[in-house]
């Protein structure tokens, strides 16, 4: 544990602590718990918030010590911060590591027209595969969908995100704070 003293005047950025909440209708959303002040430092390094996909730009934050876990997230202006590390910094503060991500609204589809549930998710790239089939080519697109831990999906489930239907292919659910799903779809060229 560091014995560093933090100047309160350096906590000059407004952030909001968020937690995932389920509505009576079954949709999940990030809701503000409380405002906080933070010292925010953007990094040129990538934050590897996903074990399966590629990372995102990182940020380091210092906040006053408060109740929070990696199940929470932060909002900094319009930017969503996906928490990846929380470490005590002296007696009064916490040092946070976060990934700057875009949160999409994801729907689980029973079929192409029936929505089962809605939740926030983060897409990250995995890789794209190309297969030459006679007489045409297809692209097998693959992404990784990172979800809050309460969201569990089965292989074969259809999810709609950014206007396209994707199939859940491979679940990665061992992390105690999030789930990751390899999703894919085939597109004719």
Tell where the protein language model's regions lie, with residue ranges.
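Short, well-ordered beta-strand segments in soluble/periplasmic domains
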Residues: 145-146
């Amino acid at each position: 544990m560091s014995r560093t003293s933090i100047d309160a005047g350096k906590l000059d950025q407004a952030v909001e602590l968020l937690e995932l909440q389920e509505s009576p209708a079954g949709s999940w959303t990030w809701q503000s718990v409380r405002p906080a002040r933070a010292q925010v430092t953007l990094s040129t390094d990538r934050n590897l918030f996903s074990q399966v996909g590629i990372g995102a730009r990182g940020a380091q934050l210092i906040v006053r010590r408060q109740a929070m876990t990696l199940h929470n997230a932060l909002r900094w202006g319009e930017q969503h911060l996906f928490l990846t590390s929380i470490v005590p910094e002296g007696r009064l503060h916490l040092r946070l590591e976060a990934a700057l991500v875009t949160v999409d609204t994801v729907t689980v589809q029973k079929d192409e027209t029936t929505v089962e549930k809605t939740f926030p998710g983060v897409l990250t790239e995995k890789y794209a595969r190309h297969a030459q089939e006679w007489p045409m080519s297809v692209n097998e697109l693959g992404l990784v969908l990172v979800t809050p831990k309460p969201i569990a999906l089965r292989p074969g489930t259809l999810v709609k995100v950014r206007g396209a239907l994707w199939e859940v292919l491979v679940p990665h659910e061992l992390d105690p704070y999030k789930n990751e799903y390899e999703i894919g779809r085939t597109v004719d060229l």
